[in-house]
Structure formats: C-alpha cells, structure tokens
UniProtKB/Swiss-Prot annotation:
It comes from the Eukaryota. Residues 1-22 form the signal peptide. This is Protein Wnt-8b. Ligand for members of the frizzled family of seven transmembrane receptors. Plays a role in the initiation of dorsal axis development. May activate a Nieuwkoop center-like signaling pathway. In adults, in brain. PROSITE patterns: WNT1 (PS00246). Keywords: Developmental protein, Disulfide bond, Extracellular matrix, Glycoprotein, Lipoprotein, Secreted, Signal, Wnt signaling pathway. A lipid is attached at residue 259 (O-palmitoleoyl serine). Its main location: secreted. GO terms for biological process: canonical Wnt signaling pathway; cell fate commitment; determination of dorsal identity; gastrulation; neuron differentiation; positive regulation of transcription by RNA polymerase II.
Amino acid sequence: MFYTGSFWFIFFILPAIPFCHSWSVNNFLMTGPKAYLIYSSSVAAGAQSGIEECKYQFAWDKWNCPERTLQLSSHSGLRSDLNIHSTGASPAGSGLYDTGPTSPVWSINFNRILFSRLESHFNKTFLSRLQIPFPQGHTVQSATSLSTGFLSPANRETAFVHAISYAGVMYTLTRNCSLGDFDNCGCDDSRNGQLGGQGWLWGGCSDNVGFGETISKQFVDPLETGQDARAAMNLHNNEAGRKAVKSTMKRTCKCHGVSGSCTTQTCWLQLPEFREVGNYLKEKYHKALKVDLFHGAGNSAASRGAIAETFRSISKKEIVHLEDSPDYCLENKTLGLLGTEGRECLKRGKALSKWEKRSCRRLCGDCGLAVKERRADMVSSCNCKFHWCCAVKCEQCRKSVTKYFCVKKEKRGGGIPRKKESKLKKKL
C-alpha cells in the first residue's frame, strides 16, 4: 500500500453515514460495513499525510500546524474531529485521549467508534481479528459516549487543515487504486485512443483520480449535516483540497515514430509528489478569501439560501474562511496555542530559502522576543566504508552546531525592560 503506518488516523464520525448506504464506483457495488473496511485504512493514511504536509508547510510560520489546534469541529460539535492512535510514545503532556478545551487534535478515537458501529453487523470474534488498537481503559461499550467542548475557529488555518487533509485522502485513494490495492478499480483508460491535442493521443495508464474523488466525497462530505455558514465553509474547503489534487496532475508522454522521430505521442495523467499539492494549497492559503457571513446562521430558509448563493459565487479552487486569525505570537490556552516563545528558528545555511532565513525575525522579532544562540553537539555516522563481504562500517563523528531559539528579552537592573528603560531616559 502506498501510505501505511502503525496507527489509525481519521477525521470523521461514522454515524453520520448510514451503513445501508450504497457505493457504486466503476460499476462495482458495495453496501454496508464492507465499504468502510476496504477503504478506511487508505482514508486514515491519507488524512495523516495531509497533516504531515501541513506541519512541513508551516514549520517556520507563527502558526506551525500544532496538534492541539487541528481539531476540525463543526456545527454538530463532533463532525470532523481528528484522531490518531500510535504505537509510539506520545509527546509529553499531549493528553492523547483527553477531552475538553485543551485537548489535542486526537481527542476522538475513530477505532472505538468504528467498533461500536460494526458490532451490529459482525460478531466480536471477527472484529477482534481486525486488530484495531484501543486506548488503555476504553472498551467497545464506552465508544459511543464521546464528547468534546472545543470548537475550532473558522479561520484560514482551520480552512487549510480541511483542504490539505481531504486532498491527502483523495490522493492516497487514487494512488492505492492505481497500485492495484482495490479489486474494483485500476488505471483510468476511459479516454485512451482519443485525440488529446495536436500530435498526441490519450493512452497508457492514467492515475484514476475520478475514483479517489468519488470515494473521498462519499466518505467525507455527508458528515457536514449542518446548513449553516460553517458547514458551507467546510464543504467548500473539502472541495478546494480535491481540486488541488486534480490541478497538480502531471501529463506524461511517450514518443512513437521511426528512429525516435516522435511523430505521435501517447500521454497519460500522473499524480505529482504530494509536496506539490501542499505547495499549491499553501499559495491558496495566502490568498484565502474571507466570507462575511455570521457562521452560526442557518436556521431559516432565507439565511440558508443566502449562504448557498454566497458560496456558489466563489471558485471551488479557493480556500475560504469566516473569521480572522488570532495573534499566534501569544499563548492562548483556550485555543490551544502555545505562542512562539521557545520556538526554534533558522538564520544561516546555504540551502535555506528566503522564508526560512527570515524565520527568526518572523517568530522572534515580530513577536517582541529575542533570539538566543545555543551550541549543541551532534553525533552522526561518517566516513562509511564497504567491507567485503558484506558490511558497511562507519565512524561516529561529533559535530558542534548552532541553533537559535525565541526567548523573552532580558531585563536590566531594576527589572525594567530595555524598551521601557529607553523611554524613561527620554522623559528624564
């Protein structure tokens, strides 16, 4: 499988999609729990790849896609909650299975919900063979009693998380389909033999992006049961994520002709590296559109109509949000924000981009913090040599590196900060 891992990661609540729902893709019909079992691991892995890409794209931003603020809540309170179960150790103080305002993104456990909803269809012996891990102290019976008090803000960062997560789901489903992981789909050859443009025909094995789009929609979009502005925003950003995958598809061609003359070409569409999808959506994030609607509205037919009309007028490729972002320089426990104090930044390095080189100014200076230099020793393998037969032996080299961190500005004698002290001197 293209994306796998030692965890289950998913961001929706299964009860929103009835198990009697029928799935029809490429003339292959599935009903009931089988559909979830076949695709759930790809959906989970795709969501995880989206979050990892989010962390990469915002690594040197004030908001760096922190786990505590990734919850994709919506008007129902539990529509889009992210969850992760990992066999590795969780970060200190992460509260992996806590709930409440400061709970991390992974507060709702998909595995418990999956088990509880499948119990009525399969016996427990079969379910135990699936080897879906449970958090300590939780059972199938407790799976339905889930709640959280944290509703993520409808700002551009939440919008990006929706878009990149659902792009990851569609991307992974498409890739795994082309790799033959599903019996009911394969390459998209629907246009093979047709004229694609001057001098080339469709042919080869195109990645089946239509399959990935269809399944991701059927898994995700029905969860948005609300008709308010927040639900409309989430659905719009879901689609923006899927459009990003389609917009970044690459056309690959093969020449045909005598002696490599390339008289004609056959071409097919391939998925790009997921990094390109992330780059595409990061640009959309910077140009995100704010929709001036009250995001709690939606109880009347008139307001629902106004919301629908507003979102129809916006391109599906654009990321949209309803609220302004908070000040990410500052700690905000209610929103699960830690601020930029203590964050590492970059200053020097040949391979650094302009954005990375300016990270200390952005994370520290712009937030009223100082940059502190720290020296650290790193040990790594070096001078590796191949020895017959058959081993590679390396030396352990110690290297001193310089790292930079954002810290509070030092105070001079008397406890007066430097800026305030200079103002005081002027008055005197």
